[in-house]
């Protein structure tokens, strides 16, 4: 399974007015069962689902139990290791803020690798760990590489301060492994900056 989305957004330009419920009822009937339009609304001219966004929230789900959950295995990364959550949280704190994230992308020809991460929250219960990322935007594979890096910190195979060394070096080989796509969810796209930074 690839990356999932609970809060994917899209925009279309209509010639004329769509009747109420057109997208949430009529279009939903034509979509496959794993895709659903939950809400639709009108926006001002010039709105673009991707270009008008001011931020995004991603969640990465990890299953640390010895055996993978048969129901959730397509939506979590099975990683049966004992993790130091406090160390992961300390490393996450070093990654927040505005930085050059060249070490945390697999795309070499990015025009700019500067991004702002407002928060990385690491937590969980039992065998389930969630890592939540909130920022202005993310580079190609960035969230998955950040996740792999934090998991290495949690295992004790990577020092906490190494996450900063990777940032400064701008060298992909200094960062952690690429975590699999199946644990990653686009949780929400933000269009009003104040509402999600407070």
Regions found by a protein language model. Name each.
Residues 1-198:
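Structured-RNA-binding interfaces characteristic of tRNA pseudouridine synthases
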